[in-house]
Amino acid sequence: MKYDLLIAGFGTAGSIAAIAAARRGASVLVLEKNTYPGGTHTGGFLPGYYLQPASGLMAEIDAMVEKRIAGGTWAGGRTEVKKYILEEEALRYGATIRYGAIPTAVEVRDGAVTGVTWYEGTRRYSAEIRQALDATGEAALCRLAGCELTGGRASDGQFQPFTNTMCRRGERSIGAANFDAGRIDQTSAEELSAGMLETLLVHLSDDYTKSMELLAPSDLPGIREGVHIVSEQQLTMEDFFSGSADCTEVVGYAYSNIDTHANDMPFESTLFQDWMIGCSMWGTALWFPLPRRALVPRGFRNLQAASRCWGVDHDLGHALRMNAAMGTIGEAAAEWAVLAANRNCALLEVPYGELAARLPLPPSPLPENDRFLKLDAEAVRSGLAGKTPGFAQWSSLRLPREMLLSWFAEAEDSDFKRHLAFALALRNEPAVLPLLRRMFAQRDPFQPETSRKYNHARGYVALYFLGRLADAELVEPIGQVLLDQQSDHRYEYASHAIGALLRIGQAHPERRAGIGAILRKFAEDPDQILMARLKGTADTMKRMDGAFRITVARTLNDWGIPHRIGETLQKLPLDFHEWRMAERLQAR
């Protein structure tokens, strides 16, 4: 058999892609490992949207679902109805759907995927294809094709925390009990199995009434991040905020905050921490471009990644993974593939104008971001004196340094001056170090109101910036904070103390011996405990010191400082993922 388009994955993006391509008259082969369509939207029990509503074909499908529900009673509610609608629409337009199908090989010639082999149980099948679309989430097809992949944060390769989702009974519908459950390597069958069993404990409750009766585990764990393709255009957080991202050929726009679930923030990138910690900007929702070249793996002519594995970096991946955005890129990828198949050409040879004409593209909403990111000097000055200084701090990066320094020199100690100190610290300005030290020493408790949630106290934000500026004068006081188990905001201060000490040690090799001694006192003492609340839960606390000890041990190894942290790790109640991290550390 020969098909115009192969779609691997019939989930949130893949189901929309299959319907869109089949409607255009393309012959479509869908390979889905599960037994139903919709992915996270259906089997994941998350039928809704985050901040951005559906658009285009996805909105059309949702309208069909609502109409079907209004006509009668359906067991399972929207999630089950949506399965029926998606399958019906794909079949109605002639798509071939193979459930329980696992791709095992692809044929690649001159940068084009020309054939696929898959298994259904023990039976082997194959087909020739003209265009290919990877909508698996984990880049299964791209892996088989030999695409270059990246993923995880730069410091240690870790992905975002995942969710062990359970189906629960709502008042009038079926919903999801959707709590963070720590980190997991979903590519390891052993770790995935152990992790899913262990993290069921997050659902233990004293009361299962009030719409919280648990019905079943989700078929699909809430995996927020895996690998990303290295694409023809990699969309990065740095390029987005600097304005250097090419937005001339977009297939749509996503609206979201940079929705991180990480609670070990000191190991994220500097830019990411500047946004989240330095300016308390977690809740700031922005418009992001979805460039078409970010869908194409570098060097390939007819292959696209239309799922969360598409070409973005770890930092922006926190925002560009939501259901609405996945529907948008699924529809766009299908339209693009059909045009390329009809022209018998490579994807990038299809004129952008032809593709754009087929898409429900709105006028660019990107200028709306300016109200948060491009305040003028007067608004910056006013904002720095207020309760929501984050927008002014970020916007200040566009103002002349000399202007900010003159404001700083003229100002008395005040909220304005302290917020301005953070703005200048974003530029590595050493003149603010004395004030940062004072805020840290005072444990300044002021919390801004920039974000709707997760604002950060000035005291430990100052500690973050002291590490960012590699202030070697405060090594001993920072060490005292790390080892003090009775302090308020113990987790926040201790975690950022570790981050600061590691940064200072990287910048000042002559201080590594002393810093190493402090870090060893923490990491070799099994009674040093760090607890953090899992996001999405009211009171579920997770012990985090194991992960921090592992990072400290890795760094001390790199510095050539002997330690006995491995012996301490053997005594701790590490979770499944930490054990694997510890094993890899020992194997180095």
Question: Where in the sequence are the language-model features?
Answer:
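Beta1/beta-strand and adjacent pyrophosphate-binding region of the FAD-binding site
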Residues: M1-A13
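Alpha-helix capping and helix-loop boundary segments enriched in small/acidic/polar residues
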Residues: G9-T12, Y49, W74-G77, G317-A325, ...
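Short glycine/serine- and small hydrophobic-enriched flexible loop segments
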Residues: I19, R23, A332-N342, L502-Q506, ...
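Conserved N-terminal/central alpha/beta ligand/cofactor-binding core
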Residues: A20, A26-S27, E32-R109, T150, ...
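Flavin (FAD/FMN)-binding glycine-rich loop and adjacent Rossmann-like elements that form
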Residues: T40, Y119-E120, R124-Q131, A135-A385, ...
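Short, hydrophobic/aromatic-rich segments at coil-to-beta transitions
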Residues: D110-V116
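Amphipathic alpha-helical scaffolding segments comprising HEAT/armadillo-like alpha-solenoid repeats
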Residues: E368-E378, L397-E410, E429-T450, D471-Q485, ...
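Structural detector for internal amphipathic alpha-helices that build alpha-solenoid repeat scaffolds
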Residues: A385-R398, S406, E410, D415-P430, ...
